[in-house]
From Swiss-Prot:
This is Protein Smaug homolog 1. Residues 309-318 have a biased composition (Polar residues). Its main location: cytoplasm. PANTHER family: PROTEIN SMAUG HOMOLOG 1, STERILE ALPHA MOTIF DOMAIN CONTAINING PROTEIN 4-RELATED. It comes from the Eukaryota. It comes from Xenopus laevis. Residues 319-379 form the SAM domain. The gene is samd4a. The keyword Glycosyltransferase does not apply. GO terms for biological process: nuclear-transcribed mRNA poly(A) tail shortening.
Length: 710
C-alpha cells in the first residue's frame, strides 16, 4: 500500500472518531516525532489559529476560576458540555483554575455514574484530565479511582458500543501509569518528558527550558499504548501491512468503502507531496488485498481468471463466516493476489483445499504449495493452543505464548456454536462458583481491596473458562479464551511485566472486536481486562524500575525478607519468613516487607486450598516423586514467571513452579529500610524442608478440593 493510500485510510478512520478520540490518537502519534517535527507542527498550528478570536474568548473563560465556579449552579447537562469545551484549554501553571476543575469533576462523575447518564461524556472528561499537562500526579491519582467506577458501570450493561468506547480511556490510563513510574524510554532520541521541553499551552506547542507544573506530557514511545493506537501508528503507516482485525477499535472506526481523496492536514501537505511517494488511487475496504488494486498483483499466471471471479459472492463480508480476516492473512503470507479465489468459498471449503483444487484454479505451483502448508498450519492451531495452555500452567516465560496468541488471532477464525449446551452450562457453573476463600477471608480480602490489593476471587474468575470439559477442535474461540484465562492468572500472581501486560490487553481488545467470539466469552475477556488494568493501576511509583533492578541482581540474591503473610515472591510459596525467620540477601542492600498480621491459620488454609496447582498436586501425590517434591516443589526463581531460572550460588536452589496468589503491595514494596537477620544456612535449609513437608501434607489431604483455579 502506497503512502497516499495509507493517509487516505487514516483520514477515513479519523473522521469516524469523536473529538476526544481524535485528540488521543493525534497525541499518541505526536509522541513519536522528533523535536524538529514537533516545532514545525507548533508553527503550523499557531499560524492556523492566529485569527481565531472565538478560541481566545473560550481560552480566557477556561482559565478564569470565577467562571468555572459559577458552573456549579448550572444543570449537569450544561456543566458537562462546558467542561468538554473548556477543560482542554486550561493553561499549565494556572493552579487556581485547575483546582476549580478538580473540585467540579468528581461531582459530575459521581452524578453520571449514580444516574447512569452521560457515561460517554464522563469517559471523555477523564481522558482529557489524565493526559492534560496541567494536572499533576496527585490530581491523576485522585481521578484514577473513577476509572474503576466507570468500568464497573459499563460491564454491568455490556454491549458492543460500550465495550468499544471504553477503550477511549486506554491512552489516558497508560499515560497516567507511565508518569507514575517515571519511565525513561528514549527510543525517539528525546531524553524524557522533563528534558524534552515540550508542553501544551493555549497557543499550541511551546518549547521551554523547564517543564510544566508536573513535568508536562511525556512524548516518549511506549509499548503499553493501546493496540488501536499502535496499529494505526506503526502497522498502517510504517510497515504498510494492515490487519483489519486489529484496527477495528469501535463500530464507528470501521473505514468507509470509499475514502475521500484528500491528504492529512489539508493545507499542510500538498497533493504533489503525497504523489511523490507513489500512488495509484484511494483504496476501498479491502482494496490493497485484492488483485485489482494491489501493486504486487502482477507477475505470475492466473490473475485474469481471478479477476473474473472477483464479481462472485464475497464471503469476506459475511458475519461469522470466519472469512473476514482471510485477506489480511493472505497478505501476511504474500499471497494477497489470490484473495479473489477465496472470496466465493466458505471457511470449511477453504480448510479442505488441496493442490488439485488449486491447480484447477490456475494457481502456480509455488503458491499452491505455500497455500496448502498454510492451511495445514491453520488446522494445527487447536493443538497449539492446548500446548500453550500447558506451557502457561507450568510457569516460565509468558512472552512466547503471548506472541503465539497474537499470531493466531490474526488468522481466520470461525465462530463455533455447539448444538448442545453442555459447555455453556459448565461455563456458567464456573462463573457462579463462590470466590476462592471468600467465606474464610472475606474481611481480610475486603481490606486488601480497599488498599489496592488483588482479591482472591479475581484469580478464580480468570479460570472460569478452564474447566475439565474438552472442547472440539472446531471451537478455536473457546480454546483461545481458555488460554487467555490461564495467562490472566499468571499475570495477576507473577512479578509485574509491563510489556506482557500491554501485550495481553492488546490481545483482549482484538478479541472483543472479533465476531468469532461469543458474548459470554467477550464478557469474560472484558472482566479479565479490567482485573489486569486494576493490577496495573495499583503498581507503586517506580515499581517497575525497581523490579528491573531486582532482576539484574537476582544472581547474587537469595530471597526477600517476608512478613507473616509470606507472599514476597511471585513464583514461590511462603519461605522462611512464614515461620518467623528470614533470609539475609547477599546483596549489600537489604529489604524488608512489613507484616500484614494475618492469623497463622490462614496460612494453612491458603497452602491447602489455593496455593497448590494441579501440576504440583500430581507431583506430590506420587510417592516416587515425593522426595523430589521436597526439594523443588515450591521454590521458583526470584526473577518471576517471566524470567529464566536463576543459576544462583545460593544453597537454596529454585526451580520453576506455579505462582501463588499475592497482592501487588507485598510483591512490589522494595523501598524499605535495611535489615539484617543473623541466621545460619543449615538452619534455613531445615526450616524450608519442614515447611515443604507441611505444605505437601496439606495438599495430599486436599486432593478432592475443586476450588483451585488452576
Amino acid at each position: 500500500m502506497m503512502f497516499r493510500d495509507q493517509v487516505g485510510m487514516l483520514s477515513g478512520w479519523f473522521k469516524g472518531w469523536n473529538e476526544c478520540e481524535q485528540t488521543v490518537a493525534l497525541l499518541s502519534l505526536l509522541k513519536r516525532v522528533s523535536r524538529t517535527q514537533a516545532r514545525f507542527l507548533q508553527i503550523c498550528l499557531e499560524h492556523s489559529l492566529v485569527d481565531c478570536t472565538e478560541l481566545h474568548i473560550l481560552e480566557g473563560e477556561a482559565n478564569n476560576p470565577a467562571i468555572i465556579n459559577q458552573w456549579q449552579q448550572e444543570s449537569k447537562d450544561k456543566v458537562i458540555s462546558q467542561l468538554l469545551t473548556h477543560l482542554p484549554l486550561l493553561k499549565p501553571g494556572n493552579i487556581d483554575a485547575k483546582m476549580a476543575y478538580m473540585k467540579l469533576l468528581p461531582k459530575i462523575l459521581a452524578h453520571s455514574i449514580e444516574h447512569n447518564q452521560h457515561i460517554e461524556e464522563s469517559r471523555q472528561l477523564l481522558s482529557y484530565a489524565l493526559i492534560h499537562p496541567a494536572t499533576s500526579l496527585d490530581d491523576r491519582s485522585a481521578l484514577a479511582m473513577w476509572l474503576n467506577h466507570l468500568e464497573d458501570r459499563t460491564s454491568g450493561n455490556f454491549s458492543t458500543q460500550s465495550r468499544c468506547r471504553s477503550d477511549s480511556l486506554d491512552y489516558g490510563q497508560m499515560q497516567y501509569y507511565h508518569q507514575r513510574q517515571n519511565s525513561d524510554d528514549k527510543q525517539n532520541g528525546w531524553p524524557n518528558s522533563r528534558d524534552s521541553g515540550i508542553c501544551i499551552s493555549s497557543s499550541g506547542w511551546q518549547e521551554k527550558n523547564t517543564g510544566c507544573e508536573n513535568g508536562h506530557l511525556p512524548l516518549y514511545s511506549s509499548s503499553s499504548v493501546p493496540s488501536t493506537i499502535n496499529a494505526i501508528g506503526t502497522s498502517t503507516i510504517l510497515s504498510g501491512q494492515t490487519h483489519h482485525s486489529s484496527l477495528k477499535r469501535s463500530v464507528s472506526l470501521t473505514p468507509p468503502m470509499n475514502v475521500p481523496n484528500q491528504p492529512l492536514g489539508h493545507g499542510w501537505m500538498s497533493h504533489e507531496d503525497l504523489r511523490a511517494r507513489g500512488s495509484q488511487g484511494i483504496p476501498s475496504d479491502h482494496a490493497p488485498l485484492s488483485p485489482q488494486s494491489s501493486v504486487a498483483s502482477s507477475g505470475s499466471g492466473g490473475s485474469e481468471h481471478l479477476e473474473e471471479q472477483s464479481t462472485a459472492c464475497n464471503t469476506f463480508q459475511d458475519e461469522g463466516s470466519g472469512m473476514k480476516d482471510v485477506p489480511a492473512w493472505l497478505k501476511s503470507l504474500r499471497l494477497h493476489k489470490y484473495a479473489a479465489l477465496f472470496s466465493h468459498i466458505t471457511y470449511d471449503e477453504m480448510m479442505s483445499l488441496n493442490e488439485c483444487h488449486l491447480e484447477a484454479q490456475n494457481v502456480t505451483k509455488g503458491a499452491r504449495h505455500k497455500i496448502v502448508i498454510s492451511i495445514q498450519k491453520l488446522k494445527e492451531r487447536h493443538n497449539l493452543l492446548k500446548t500453550l495452555e500447558r506451557d502457561v500452567l507450568e510457569g516460565g516465560n509468558l512472552r512466547v505464548p503471548l506472541q503465539e496468541l497474537h499470531q493466531i488471532i490474526l488468522t481466520p477464525i470461525k465462530a463455533c456454536f455447539p448444538q448442545n449446551s453442555n459447555t455453556e452450562e459448565h461455563d456458567q457453573e464456573a462463573d457462579s462458583q463462590p470466590p476462592l476463600l471468600a467465606s474464610k477471608n472475606q474481611a481480610t480480602e475486603s481490606k486488601d481491596s480497599a488498599s489496592g490489593g488483588i482479591q482472591q476471587h479475581h484469580i478464580g474468575n480468570c479460570e472460569s473458562e478452564s474447566g475439565g470439559v474438552p472442547l472440539p477442535e472446531s471451537d478455536l474461540p473457546g480454546q483461545f479464551t481458555r488460554v487467555m484465562g490461564k495467562v490472566c492468572t499468571q499475570l495477576l500472581v507473577s512479578r509485574p511485566d509491563e510489556e506482557n501486560i500491554s501485550s495481553y490487553l492488546q490481545l483482549i481488545d482484538k478479541c472483543l472486536t472479533h465476531d468469532a467470539f461469543t458474548e459470554t466469552q467477550k464478557k469474560r475477556l472484558l472482566s479479565w481486562k479490567q482485573q489486569v488494568q486494576k493490577l496495573f493501576r495499583s503498581f507503586p511509583r517506580k515499581s517497575l524500575l525497581d523490579v528491573a533492578g531486582y532482576r539484574q541482581q537476582r544472581k547474587t540474591s537469595v530471597d526477600v525478607l517476608i512478613g507473616s503473610r509470606g507472599f514476597g515472591q511471585s513464583n514461590s510459596l511462603p519461605t522462611a519468613g512464614s515461620v518467623g525467620s528470614g533470609i539475609a540477601r547477599r546483596n549489600p542492600r537489604q529489604f524488608q516487607i512489613p507484616s500484614r498480621n494475618l492469623p497463622s491459620t490462614r496460612l494453612s488454609l491458603l497452602g491447602a486450598s489455593s496455593l497448590l496447582g494441579a501440576t504440583q498436586r500430581a507431583s506430590a501425590s506420587n510417592p516416587a516423586m515425593l522426595k523430589q517434591g521436597r526439594q523443588n516443589l515450591w521454590f521458583a526463581n526470584p526473577g518471576g514467571s517471566n524470567s529464566m531460572p536463576s543459576r544462583s550460588h545460593s544453597s537454596v536452589q529454585r526451580t520453576r513452579s506455579l505462582p501463588v496468589h499475592t497482592s501487588p503491595q507485598t510483591m512490589l514494596m522494595f523501598q524499605q529500610q535495611d535489615f539484617q537477620v543473623p541466621v545460619t544456612e543449615p538452619d534455613i535449609n531445615n526450616r524450608l524442608e519442614s515447611l515443604c513437608l507441611s505444605m505437601t501434607e496439606h495438599a495430599l489431604g486436599d486432593g478432592v478440593d475443586r476450588t483451585s483455579t488452576i
